[in-house]
């Protein structure tokens, strides 16, 4: 055998050994990727099983079965070393796909956790205010002086401000009681005191009585008063009581939808201008939206001391007060709530690309000066805000505004459930988490989604409204002495609304 033959033999030997080492390295890499794919699949399994995601029709089991089959295939393929590259590509696809799925499910869980955490906070700003012209220059000038405040209405918050002022600025003030914040403002204008206490929740009420209120005063000191709340389901038999009982799985329930009158954080205490009870029956696929006009003259629970006032004023005592007030009015439990502010409309409606509503009367809105003709309308966020705020240009006034609230809510619900919106779910959730509060848990949402997957039946949405007749001069607990427009509830209309709610609940 020649030297050249020996040389070729050695080269072929080295080639076989080199190729074998390459396969061995690829085999080890594949095992690493298979393990990573198993971990990612395990995360998917955790979210699917823990939160019952896609449990309708057992879709979650199909997903888990598919992932399990692919993992088994990867193990078998890796045993066939000739298919090492195919194994690597498939394992990479599983890692990326499962990781993305786990990420999206984790984002959804965090989204609801954030919304539910938002419900635990309620904030308002307590201020010491003086006249913009001729008032004191600095809060230190009030040391030892008298300030005006409605202790009978708001003692706890007023005292919190006084204590904070004393602790942080060493300024001690004496509080002189007046009947209301409106009375305090009037006496401030009359020069009977140098300063008044002001609760931010009442500012919009004062602006409604005196359009130049904000320009007439200046704030010397502000204290952001944050309280912890935990709104539980409201019982109808006692407006100021709660129950920890929540509806059983797939049972009908009531959801209170509140739209607050502010552009600030959703946790801000404010009047509730939108008051809708959504009665949802997952078995019959019915949703009944019952609107109660903001001016409805009803007994206000909790901070309202069960005295009659405008429904909108319940919001200044917190979302629980509104829930309890409506639960007693309609003689029905209210299990959950969603609270959003007008900033929410601006954020969410633009995020989903606008909404479509049918307008049954032409009008021009005071806000934005938008012209709304009769017929189908496509609204962006700002147009929708003008659409839901307007009442003076509508033939039915506040009743018609309530109907427009329902139209926008219904249109938004439909848009949020569309395929296009689902594709941008992350952006929608990011926007909503900044401007929505709810105690509706993820588990209840998954119940509804899974039931919908099981049946495939669309929901029938019906809108109704409580009616009454207008009246001026009725006493207001929040604004004693003020001449306010109220809507005295029509008892026949109330009985009809109560019966409709009970019918959808299956009672």
Task: Give residue spans per PLM region.
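Internal/C-terminal transmembrane anchor helices
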Residues: 83-106
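N-terminal Sec-pathway targeting helices
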Residues: 23-34, 75-91
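Non-catalytic, solvent-exposed segments at the cell envelope interface
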Residues: 113-121, 131-132, 138-139, 146-153, ...
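A short, flexible N-terminal coil/short beta segment enriched in small residues
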Residues: 90-97, 137-140, 279-280
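Membrane-anchoring/interfacial helices and their immediately flanking loops
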Residues: 1-40
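Hydrophobic alpha-helical transmembrane segments in integral membrane proteins
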Residues: 101-118
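Membrane-embedded alpha-helical segments of integral membrane proteins
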Residues: 27-76
């Amino acid at each position: 055998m020649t030297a050249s033959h020996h040389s070729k033999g050695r080269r072929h030997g080295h080639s076989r050994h080199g190729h074998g080492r390459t396969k061995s390295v690829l085999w080890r890499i594949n095992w690493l990727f298979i393990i990573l794919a198993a971990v990612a699949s395990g995360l998917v399994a955790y979210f699917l099983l823990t939160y019952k995601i896609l449990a309708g029709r057992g879709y979650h089991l199909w997903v888990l079965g598919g992932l399990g089959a692919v993992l088994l295939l990867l193990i078998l393929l890796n045993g066939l070393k000739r298919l090492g590259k195919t194994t690597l590509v498939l394992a990479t696809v599983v890692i990326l796909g499962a990781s993305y799925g786990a990420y999206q499910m984790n984002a959804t869980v965090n989204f609801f956790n954030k919304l539910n955490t938002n419900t635990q906070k309620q904030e308002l700003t307590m201020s010491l205010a003086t006249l913009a012209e001729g008032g004191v220059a600095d809060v230190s000038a009030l040391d030892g002086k008298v300030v005006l405040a409605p202790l009978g209405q708001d003692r706890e918050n007023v005292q919190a401000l006084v204590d904070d002022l004393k602790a942080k600025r060493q300024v001690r003030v004496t509080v002189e009681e007046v009947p209301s914040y409106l009375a305090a403002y009037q006496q401030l204008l009359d020069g009977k005191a140098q300063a008044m206490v002001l609760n931010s929740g009442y500012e919009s009420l004062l602006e409604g009585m005196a359009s130049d209120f904000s320009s007439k005063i200046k704030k010397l000191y502000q204290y952001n008063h944050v309280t912890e709340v935990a709104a539980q389901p409201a019982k109808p038999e006692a407006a100021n009581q709660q129950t920890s009982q929540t509806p059983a799985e797939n049972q009908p329930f009531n959801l209170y939808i509140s739209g607050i009158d502010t552009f600030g954080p959703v946790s801000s205490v404010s009047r509730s201008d939108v008051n809708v009870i959504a009665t949802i029956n997952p078995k019959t696929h019915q949703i009944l939206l019952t609107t109660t006009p903001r001016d409805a003259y009803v007994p206000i629970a909790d901070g309202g001391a069960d005295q009659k006032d405008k429904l909108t004023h319940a919001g200044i005592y917190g979302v629980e007060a509104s829930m309890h007030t409506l639960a007693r009015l309609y003689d029905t439990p209210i299990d959950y709530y969603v609270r959003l502010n007008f900033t929410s409309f601006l954020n969410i409606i633009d995020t989903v690309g606008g909404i479509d509503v049918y307008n049954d009367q032409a009008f021009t809105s005071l806000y934005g000066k938008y012209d709304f003709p009769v017929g189908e309308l496509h609204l962006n966020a700002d147009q929708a805000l003008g659409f839901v705020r307007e009442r003076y240009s509508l033939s039915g006034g506040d009743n018609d505004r309530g109907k427009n609230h329902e139209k926008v809510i219904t249109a938004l619900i439909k848009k949020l459930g569309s395929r296009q919106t689902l594709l941008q779910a992350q952006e929608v959730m990011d926007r909503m988490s900044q401007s929505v509060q709810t105690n509706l848990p993820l588990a209840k949402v998954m119940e509804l989604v899974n039931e919908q997957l099981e049946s495939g039946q669309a929901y029938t949405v019906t809108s109704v409204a409580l009616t009454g007749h207008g009246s001026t001069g009725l006493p207001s607990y929040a604004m004693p002495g003020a001449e306010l427009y109220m809507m005295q509830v029509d008892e026949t209309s109330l009985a009809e609304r109560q019966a409709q709610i009970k019918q959808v609940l299956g009672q």
